Amino acid sequence: DDDTVDRTELAKELSHKYTEILIDEYQDTNKAQDMLFRAISDNEENLFIVGDVKQSIYGFRLAMPEIFLQKRKHLPDFNGKNYPAKINLDENFRSRKEVTEYINYVFSRVMSEDSCGINYDDSESLKAGADYEKSAFPCAELHIVDKSKIDCEYLPEASHIADIINKLVAEKMPVKTKSGYRPVMYKDICILMRGLNDADDYFD
């Protein structure tokens, strides 16, 4: 459990080759990777890591998001001079305000110190960094599926999603393109899944 790094001569030699070391998606690193990155850095002073615990998806290959959490917890805020330190990038420029508000609402209720190692409070919340044209349609919806009320041969969730998609297409919900607006088409819609175990039901 000791996370100290005893640098080999090779690690020291390699560290001289890198002015800066930048690692993205650090929430998905494991202990071995973390120690390797630290070993080839200059006492971590030139090691720049970026991560978001909410996006950790590689548990199947032993990702340890708690490594990133511990660094965030113990590093001081960057004062413009001293390293290592942390910088909180909480502004989101790619999403509507309604989306960031929805994300904050959901995660503030499901993420806690006990369950995820982090309390999702105001200091963790996303801030909308850009203004977008107001939409007449909801940017996000949360559907609770009552499986007992859906009688079908497929997964209730798959059937429910199919109904939503068919309704959007039937009602010709407008989507914005470079040349203006047009009715939504099936090819515009993407279904994100946690895994492929039940993919056949969704395909059907």
Protein language model features and the residues they cover:
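Conserved motor-region signature of P-loop NTPase helicases/translocases
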Residues: 9, 13-23, 27-204
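Conserved helicase NTPase catalytic core signature
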Residues: 1-7
